Amino acid sequence: GVIPCGESCVFIPCISSVVGCSCKNKVCYRN
């Protein structure tokens, strides 16, 4: 939840969720 994955999740889910990223405040974060 602290490291930005460089991906937004406004319209689509985080593709980077496969590496542990999750959506928070319309941006994908890791940890």
Curated annotation (Swiss-Prot):
**PTM entry text:** This is a cyclic peptide.
An annotated GO BP: defense response
Q: What InterPro entries does this protein's entry cite?
A: Cyclotide (IPR005535), Cyclotide_bracelet_CS (IPR012323), Cyclotide_sf (IPR036146)
Q: So which tissues is this one expressed in?
A: Expressed in pedicel, root and stem but not in leaf and fruit (at protein level).
Pfam families reported for this sequence: Cyclotide
Q: Which domain of life is it from?
A: Eukaryota
Arranged from A to Z, the UniProt key words for this protein are: Disulfide bond, Knottin, Plant defense
Sites of the Cyclopeptide (Gly-Asn) crosslink: 1-31
Per the UniProt entry, the disulfide pairs are: 5-21, 9-23, 14-28
**Domain comment in the entry:** The presence of a 'disulfide through disulfide knot' structurally defines this protein as a knottin.
| Family affiliation | Belongs to the cyclotide family. Bracelet subfamily.
Its function, per the record, reads: Probably participates in a plant defense mechanism.
Provide the protein name: Chassatide C5
